[in-house]
Design a protein with these regions (language model features):
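Accessory alpha-helical/coil subdomains and C-terminal extensions
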Residues: 38, 103-105, 115, 122, ...
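Short beta-strand elements at the ligand-binding edges of bilobed clamshell
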Residues: 136-146, 260-266
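N-terminal phosphate-binding or glycine-rich loops at protein starts, especially the Walker A/P-loop
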Residues: 2-49
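C-terminal non-catalytic interaction/assembly regions of soluble proteins
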Residues: 231-234, 239-323
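Glycine-rich oxoanion-binding loops at beta->alpha junctions
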Residues: 2, 48-101, 108-109, 141-148, ...
Length: 323
């Protein structure tokens, strides 16, 4: 017999991503429409362990759909990685009458949800990360906005790079995954895209390509560098020293996490948030919602975490042929 759900908790965990507020709003209002109570858990799993738990109603999420960041705040929590921390979290949920939790975050957040599910707290995960590095889904909340933010910034860097006939290295977020770099590289028509999944650490070869392009008459050169490759400032110095071409590095940093979410992030996050509540009301647990092959679907968290993600090879190939 399915466990009856009366009160649903919602939290955001790990790095913030534009669209998280749209997801929170959808969870709250969809739950209320089904006669459920909602409690917001502030600062992720750290807030759960500290019992930073607040009642939420429709007004709690008014005028939040267009806001970046997360109204519940977020944090990373080492204590929750331990079995003791997880047990404490489950007991706190029961103490506050929380039957189920919607967890918005990445793979690490899903691992926490997985542990809570095993301890009797029904959980649904929503993919919230600007990095698009969750294998079970083609879309993650915040990726679209982050790409648009980076793309617009890179356009501006290209303007000045063209004026000064420079080589410009623009570093975007993505420690273990180069999806922002790949998408922006194509969107901005970059001459070079450096991905952690593909970079061979051959700075000499990169310098040769920059020099060769200048020899062919190319007056500026845009390199999009994922932070997982990094060392942008050092690369710029090496390129300039070897070629004589003025080279500057720009690190976009945390601006990619901020800003009002795009239409796509608002709509997809809303659908995912509502779907999470629907699944919980059906008695489902230990699931993660994904957008796969054009459809919103759900996977067992264990299955989702076991999946591996690879770079879209065709996108990477054409990024080189279209230079």
């Amino acid at each position: 017999m399915a466990k009856e759900i009366n009160t649903i908790g919602v939290l955001t965990s790990g790095g913030d991503a534009p669209g998280m507020n749209a997801a929170i709003r959808a969870v709250v209002r969809q739950a209320l429409s089904k006669g459920k109570k909602v409690k917001g858990i502030k600062r992720g799993y750290a807030g759960l362990l500290n019992e930073e738990i607040v009642d939420m109603d429709s007004k709690s999420v008014s005028d939040t759909i267009s806001r970046g960041g997360t109204i519940l705040q977020t944090a990373r929590c080492k204590e929750f990685v331990t079995a003791e921390g997880q047990q404490k979290g489950a007991e706190i949920c029961k103490k506050h009458g929380i039957d189920a939790i919607v967890v918005i975050g990445g793979d690490g957040s899903f691992q926490g949800a997985q542990k809570l599910a095993a301890l009797g707290i029904n959980t649904i995960g929503l993919p919230g990360t600007i990095d698009l590095d969750i294998a079970c889904t083609d879309y993650t909340i915040g990726f679209d906005t982050a790409c648009n933010t980076a793309m617009e910034a890179i356009d501006k860097v290209r303007d000045t790079s063209t004026s000064h006939e420079r080589c410009s290295i623009i570093e975007v977020m993505g420690r273990g995954a180069g999806y922002i770099a790949l998408w922006c590289g194509l969107a901005n028509g970059a001459e070079e895209i450096l991905l952690p999944e593909k970079y061979d650490n051959s700075l000499k070869a990169l310098i040769e390509r920059v020099a060769h392009a200048r020899g062919l008459g190319k007056q500026h050169y845009i390199i999009i560098n994922a932070e997982g490759v990094g060392h942008s400032q050092e690369m710029a110095k090496e390129i300039e020293a070897a070629t004589g071409i003025e080279t500057r590095a720009t690190i976009l940093g945390h601006m990619q996490r901020g800003g009002s979410p795009s239409c796509k992030d608002r709509v997809y996050a809303t659908i995912m948030g509502a779907m999470a509540v629907d699944l919980l009301c059906e008695g489902k647990s230990n699931r993660v919602i994904a957008h796969k092959d054009g459809n919103f679907v759900d996977f067992d968290i264990d299955e989702a975490l076991a999946m591996k993600k690879s770079v879209a090879e065709y996108m990477y190939d054409i990024s080189k042929s279209l230079v």
